[in-house]
Amino acid sequence: MAATVYRPATAPIADAPCEGLVCLELEDGSAYQGYSFGAPKSIAGELVFQTGMVGYPESVTDPSYRGQILVITFPLVGNYGVPSRETVDDLLKDLPAHFESNQIHIAGLVTASYAGEDFSHFLATSSLGTWLKEQGIPAMYGVDTRALTKRIREKGSMLGRMLLQKEDLAVSAPSLGVPGDWKPHFETIEWVNPNEKNLVAEVSIKEPKLYKPDEATALKHPSGRNLRILCLDVGMKYNQLRCFIKRGVEVLVCPWDYDFSKEEYDGLFISNGPGDPKVMDTTVEHISAALQKNNTPIFGICLGHQLLARAAGAKTVKLKFGNRGHNIPCTSMVTGKCHITSQNHGYAVDATTLPTGWQELFINANDGSNEGIMHVDRPHFSVQFHPESTPGPRDTEFLFDVFIQTVAKCTTDNTLLQKGVEFPGGTTEENERLHPRVDVKKVLVLGSGGLSIGQAGEFDYSGSQAIKALKEEGIYTVLINPNIATIQTSKGLADKVYFLPVNAEFVRKVIKYEQPDAIYCTFGGQTALSVGIQLKDEFEALGVKVLGTPIDTIITTEDRELFARSMESIGEKCAKSASASSVEEALNAVKDIGYPVIVRAAYALGGLGSGFANNEAELVDLCNKALAASPQVLVERSMKGWKEIEYEVVRDAQDNCITVCNMENFDPLGIHTGDSIVVAPSQTLSDEDYNMLRTTAVNVIRHLGVVGECNIQYALNPFSREYCIIEVNARLSRSSALASKATGYPLAFIAAKLGLGIPLKEIKNTVTKVTCACFEPSLDYVVVKMPRWDLKKFTRVSTQLGSSMKSVGEVMSIGRTFEEAIQKAIRAIDFHNLGFSESKGALMSVDDELQTPSDQRLFAIANAMHAGYTVDRIWELTKIDKWFLSKLKGLSNFAKDMTKLTANDVVGRPDLLLRAKQLGFCDRQLANFWDSNELAIRRMRLEAGITPFVKQIDTVAAEFPAFTNYLYLTYNASEHDVSFEDRGVMVLGSGVYRIGSSVEFDWCSVRAIRTLRESGFKTIMVNYNPETVSTDYDEADKLYFENINLETVLDVYQMEDATGVLGAMGGQTPNNIALPLLRAGVRVLGTSPEMIDTAENRYKFSRMLDRIGVDQPTWKELTSFDEAKAFCQKVSYPVLVRPSYVLSGAAMNTVYSEADLESYLQQAADVSPEHPVVITKYIENAKEIEMDAVAKDGKVVGHFISEHVENAGVHSGDATLILPPQDLEQTTIQRIEEATRKIGAALNVTGPFNIQFIAKDNDIKVIECNVRASRSFPFVSKVMGVDLIEMATKAIMGLPFVEYPAIDRPSGGVGVKVPQFSFSRLSGADPVLGVEMASTGEVASFGVDKYEAYLKALMSTGFKVPKKNILLSIGSYKDKKEMLPSVAKLSQMGYKLFATAGTADFLQEHDIPVQFLEVLAKEDDQKSEYSLTQHLANNMIDLYINLPSNNRYRRPANYISKGYQTRRMAVDYQIPLVTNVKNAKILVEAIARYRDMEIGERDYQTSHTPLQLSGQVNFTLQDSLSRPHSFKKAHVLSVEQYTRADLHLLFTVAEEMRLSVQRGNVMDILKGRMLATLFYEPSTRTSASFEAAMKRLGGEVISIATQHSSVQKGETLQDTLRTLACYADAIVLRHPDETCVDVAKKYSPVPVVNAGNGSREHPTQAFLDLFTVREELGTVQGLTFTFVGDLRYGRPVHSLVYLLRHYSGVKVQLVSPKGLELPTDVRQQLVKAGQLLCESETLTPEILGKTDVLYCTRVQKERFPSEAEYEKVKGSYRIDNQTLKHAKSKMAIMHPLPRNEEIAEEVDFDQRAAYFRQMRYGLYCRMALLALVMSG
């Protein structure tokens, strides 16, 4: 078998000269090609891999690597360059400061990618490549190092040789490598096995040399001389020397074979080194002699450890592939503690051969191999790992102290030479006795409540993990969490779930009721922590133990002062700050802090009065302003522009401590980490930076006493090693969810176990199943987290980013390069983003946007780069590390180059396409660059064999085999990690959490996956949101952490050969790609995407409702202000207005008058044919009702109805829902059920769907229908105890299930769902409810009635029941009247009422005592007792009911009403605010009834049982066919016979036909009928289409072949027709003579259908063309049709032009060659109808830009007077991707087919190409026509 050759796996560095290829050949013959970046030469050696993520300068200078080719598993190498070779070490005087020896020892270096000259670090003086060249060491990048590591892991260490490309043999496309027989292109050299040489002799010092410590710190011998360590240098790393010298001993370094028996010394140290200890006999003899004498303590490291063991008489063995990494756990046999160590060795001591008197000191916690030995009664010990680290963690450096202390003691007391070494940290037995396991049977877990900004889905994930862990330990778990939308609160997780507020009052009640043994407060975010702090002193009395981190620790971390003091006590520093109440105090404070400082006004919200001061003048100015707003200012050291770095730290009760993941913020300090782009692991920290912060993290966490998991954030000065601790979160946080997903290490699961006292080393790594959980993951990929903001949803919100978090969700992406990962992340944020490219959006000026970051920052960087800004200029403005900026600049430059090419240029350049994919560009983006379309690029890519590879996330960088199904796609690789035999069902997740689509869709996805798995299906989850349970790797059989877009889903679907794609559970994200997936040949499970489109296209949906007789509010799409005005007058105000292209209430507004309409339309959009608006009649005071249902094949099999508390007009996502409904009349309910059944049948739904109705006086109307799971599914499923998603999944998969199952809840009782808002985080946003959704989450509670449930649910959102003062401000008279009884009730209950002017007058008239308050002018406002703002500011108001008069359309931002001002103040001062009259009424009633609430078993009830329905008959079709109409038994000869109503009937029946065909129904409408087809001209399509149509309707066909018939004998047409009429019920005729239709009309006794009369007409083609336009674009009205080609003889065009006169607003453009123009009479029709827009002989970009329907016809040679005339125009109308770049993104390309050259094949892959679908629509249309003509 030929050995495998792999082409380079990554793109070459841009803008750098190519240094040639290198081929890495292995002993087994496989060859990996890559790019050279070191010395241009070939070498051979032993191939080894190292899994550390930092520290390449230290590693390559480590003498232990002598002769080895080093493979670094972390893919990004060279990022922080190389420090100066000249700088000498302060301690070692003549040795270099930054390296482990004075030369590079590796033979060669192999990496996946390389940073080139774009390195970034304040100490760097050159790139890695430059240094390697200086030292003559070859290096290569572009190798799939993961694949290579797996090969070494499986086969063991092997020999390799790096062969340089021959200079004279250039390769045309280096990125494709040299395929096939590569050897002639590369040099060749002999194999070398370094282990056969004495490598130690090469690296050891040549003669003894003495190093002395600083006299001030020197340790002395009793005789007065310095304490001396003799070091045997068998390949010593300089840091071992540094560790000794800085501890005050002098070191005599001796060569490896030196006989040191004559030397005077106090301790013997044997260093690390390379090679096999077997060849070192001389050294072993010298050590043996020292052991015999036992004059001094002895300590060995690495090779020194192996030599000591051999000298003692033990044996050593060669390991399969060695241990080389920075994360290897070693357990001490003395203390039982587990330490994370740095290692680099290929041999080990065989512990079974240790002689008497010796025992194991450390063992490897992963594989049990020996890691250290000690003598029982002599001071001799050694370790296999590197306690001096560099690179790696410094956790075991204390062993140097142990050794030196032992040496010092032995010099004063030589009896100690007869004793073993003493180690700190107690014994294993003592430690286990001090920290026993916690014995608990029942644990209470506090959840986090509703999702809000700053506290979102990550707690669903971490809470679910914690419960899984507790269940695994057999503990009964009780959860309090009112968040009904999450998996955490589902059946099957916790044993009991309380849907109650997570606050002290209710938690106390639950504890008394449940009597748990223990409680967890660390899995519910800030909410749960606060409760823990409030109840801290009561827990003991309640008999509850706090698990995990102690509450006192939490209090320390939450309180700035306490925290700063605590840090000071261990010598760590926080940001310096001081408070001042005058300018003088501030100036004094600064002396200690130093400039620059940040000044903030204390007690001011939203960062009021804060700013930066760089000098005294600025400080004075700022303080004056701030002190005007507040009595005190805080002055704090400004670290703006510093790097922000985070570590996730885990610690168990026995003090084992690890850091699981470190993260670097792309944005510098100053932006909240939740609003920052975050990269894991850090990219620009050197080993010293990384481990300095890691060591600090471990020290801080140990000092604080955290048990479980926590997060520590630092600010790091990029120009020094100065750092500050910003904060510690002693709980699971957003970062922990991210870290878990980024590394595959299940933090929350582990933390829950640690809280039970289980030590880390006893918990298994669930991914590898063989290693333990006490280790630090090594990553061989890079992860980018990016926030998603939804600031457009709010009025008047500030878009600036700062220290307060504003994002509502986040995405995470994984790649093998930063470019690949960040481009994926940008696309994941929003469907419209294609990647890192300039955006045409309305940004502020680029400089402003870069300096004051907003949610548009990344696009501003792209625009700046596009405009030619340099990396340095952008860095000055943003302070984003230059390494990141250089990477982005590379993308920007590549994109610029690509736009110069077209698809045709790229066809022969697979290397370009490959490079683009390796840089993370998506097909859509490339299609944009190259004027093509996504599917054409895809096809080109597949033909070039360019597809992504699937890689695993395994926590160990491939060092151990992993059983992980956690996967991502990358183009930077050369092989897959997995095989594809499952053929699973793909479930598409919800994508990023945003307003309108949040955790409820994750619940749906997970429930679907669990149902599929329980039913025996293999499952594949696709999602990219790190906060979710669905991206937990144990939920599905395979998890692809990938984007949900057409390209990625197709890639996964085709690789996995999946059985189908289930998209109905993930909300709108999967729905958006359902139709394109279907068209690309994917089996989409559930309702047909064409039906989804029918429900989502307002024209199609509206027509469908009319067809089935379901009412809807009147609406119209309008293209001018006058039309809009006229429509509004007709339907009367108020109306809803919105731009036509948006869904889900984006930019919608309610308009109450013509003046409002005018200003809204000016502000929102210029109304024009390009930008139409949709206006809908707004029905005031109507109830809104939510229907959630499941259907199978169009029959409803389960449903629940919930009612909204608020009237229609509040977005359903912001509404309060009640289930079962309390105020609906039976008739309303029945009408809703009836309408639902009709809609389900018409859309042929299989699976979940949701309909929103409005009802007024029992009249119901449909607002919208979502053919997918909706936001309310978890709520109704949990309240009713019937899992609708499980039912829907079974219906979709054809599994058995029970229709309308029994409802599982006790009788009586109501569930109420209440929205959770986050206005307090969004400074400036107006907290009113409207048609735009604004809530970020939801909660629900249960009660005896709706009032109790509502109050509990409202309290769950943080609402506090008012104690005494209530302020009222009610706008409209109607609301005042409606509120009166409620206000009276408040007064009776003893509340003190305050009100604004109008409200106060009204209440006083009705004898309700009230105090008047007013918003006064600035100067009076401060002191007046009537000041409303002062009452709010001083927290004198407990509840503010502010009911604005009609929520007018959004006013421009500068208009600030008093109402807005006070509403905003209420939010800022955290005063409960109610802005809706219905909410106010139910709230008052609830407060009146339920002053204090008891908890207990809640009784549930349903007020009605759904009726069991018998099979439903579809009457509409029968009705349509039996009604009198103009098709019945009539000829169909010309389009001129038909009206718009006739067309409407034909198309309605065609839609029914389509449903029928899709359901696979056998129809017998025309059973027993016969159709004859008579074609005098050749035809395959039309005849086949009629034949298929007839047969599908149950009829038969006789086709007459005219060329063999009696026609040849001279029979006339009329005779043929009369004869056929004797056999058939109808005839389809095509004839070259235009007058044939007159003959037919005159002589045929049965209906004749014209299939083309010469070049005159082709009516059925025109019908199907119109039907196609309706189906593709929703409507025909208002469209612009462009007809191209032969318009003179193109009969379908003539018919179509005639029919278009029936549709208003249609415009026509004609493009044809001279001589083939539209016939004059047809053209006249267009002119008369006012539809002719333009005529041209060429298809110009302007014409295309206006086109909605591009209709192409054949230009045939025979139509031209001469060959020359034909040749002139032949190619001028060819439609290809190049032409289409000028076309609209939503349009249709049509062609009656067959085609010649008119449309290029590449266009077939464009979503807009409708011509093959046109054929299918034709079938439905002709079925409808035949049925109408022939039935009955």
UniProtKB/Swiss-Prot annotation:
Domain ATP-grasp, chain residue ranges per copy: 564-756, 1102-1293
Cofactor annotation remark: Binds 4 Mg(2+) or Mn(2+) ions per subunit.
Compartments in which it is found: Cytoplasm; Nucleus
Catalytic residues (UniProt): C302, H386, E388
Residue ranges constituting the MGS-like domain according to the UniProt record: 1359-1507
Chief location category: cytoplasm
Positions of Mn(2+) 3 binding: Q1252, E1264
Residues that bind ATP 2: R1138, K1177, I1179, E1184, G1209, V1210, H1211, S1212, Q1252, E1264
UniProt xrefs under Pfam families: CPSase_L_D2, CPSase_L_D3, CPSase_sm_chain, GATase, MGS, OTCace, OTCace_N
Positions contributing to Mg(2+) 3 binding: Q1252, E1264
Domain of life: Eukaryota
GO BP of this protein: 'de novo' pyrimidine nucleobase biosynthetic process; 'de novo' UMP biosynthetic process; glutamine metabolic process
Named cofactor requirement(s): Mg(2+); Mn(2+)
Residues reported to bind Mn(2+) 4: E1264, N1266
Its EC number(s): 6.3.5.5, 3.5.1.2, 6.3.4.16, 2.1.3.2
Positions of the UniProt region annotated as CPSase (Carbamoyl phosphate synthase): 443-1484
Residues that bind L-glutamine: S64, G273, G275, L303, Q306, N344, G346, Y347
Annotated domain remarks: The DHOase domain is defective. The third step of the de novo pyrimidine pathway, dihydroorotase (DHOase) is encoded by the pyr-6 gene which is both physically and genetically independent of the pyr-3 gene.
Protein name: Multifunctional protein pyr-3
